[in-house]
Amino acid sequence: NGLCCSQYGFCGTTSQYCSRANGCQSN
């Protein structure tokens, strides 16, 4: 479904969730 989850466990579809520069990983 395109959701990305941040290192803090919050999920969304915008770059703030999906950006690897923010330590996030796509599922």
UniProtKB/Swiss-Prot annotation:
Disulfide bonds join C4-C18. Gene3D superfamilies: Endochitinase-like. GO terms for molecular function: chitin binding. Residues 1-27 form the Chitin-binding type-1 domain. Keywords: Antimicrobial, Chitin-binding, Disulfide bond, Fungicide. Has potential use as a flocculating agent in water treatment processes. Seeds (at protein level). GO terms for biological process: defense response to fungus; killing of cells of another organism. Coiled coil: none annotated. SUPFAM superfamilies: Plant lectins/antimicrobial peptides. Chitin-binding protein which functions in defense against chitin-containing fungal pathogens. This is Morintide mO5. It comes from Moringa oleifera. The lineage of its organism: Eukaryota, Viridiplantae, Streptophyta, Embryophyta, Tracheophyta.
